[in-house]
Amino acid sequence: MNLVTMRDVSVAYDGYEAIQHVDLEIGDDDFLGVIGPNGGGKTTLVKAILGTVPHTGELTLAPELFRGKERLIGYMPQISDFDRAFPISVLEVVLSGLQGRRGFSSRYTKEDRARAMELLAASGIADTARSPIGEVSGGQMQRALLARAVISDPKLLILDEPANFVDNKFEKELYRTLHELNTHMAIVM
């Protein structure tokens, strides 16, 4: 079953076509790597799938990607797209991945906090939970953003440049973790 189907999708910014006439299908168990040069449209493709940029052509998300109004899509942005000055702890960053499910006015439960700490521990950064996000290293931030993307148990996980700012050891761990996650979600990176 396809979670995402794109037919003849194009996205333009101020007259410049960032992506042109893309046809793509993402199945429910796919592990898809999108490659290309800097400025080649990879992030624009991701933003089209997420619905954050206008596009032409047909882009269909399967009903399985929705629970009521909630989208079951986890997203890890490029680290450069994240505001390091925002006054929030690493733990709060991870918990913010639940906002699509809970809404902005809901409080996090004890179980939510335990799950977030479990993900931070699995990422090897539980000791940074109370640290301001702007004070952790780039690699630690990447780990926190990955935990944020998976805390809501998405059906589709989209990662934009996930291996930037991480050391070789964590990069291997990252791919091993993604392989395990791919047993119950599609992954695009």
Give the positions of each predicted feature.
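Hydrophobic anchor residue at the start of the ABC signature
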Residues: 146-147, 174
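Conserved structural motif at the start of ABC-family nucleotide-binding domains
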Residues: 4, 18-19, 129
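Conserved catalytic loops of ABC-family nucleotide-binding domains
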Residues: 177-189
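Conserved ABC transporter NBD signature motif
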Residues: 54-73
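Conserved ABC ATPase "signature" region
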Residues: 109-128
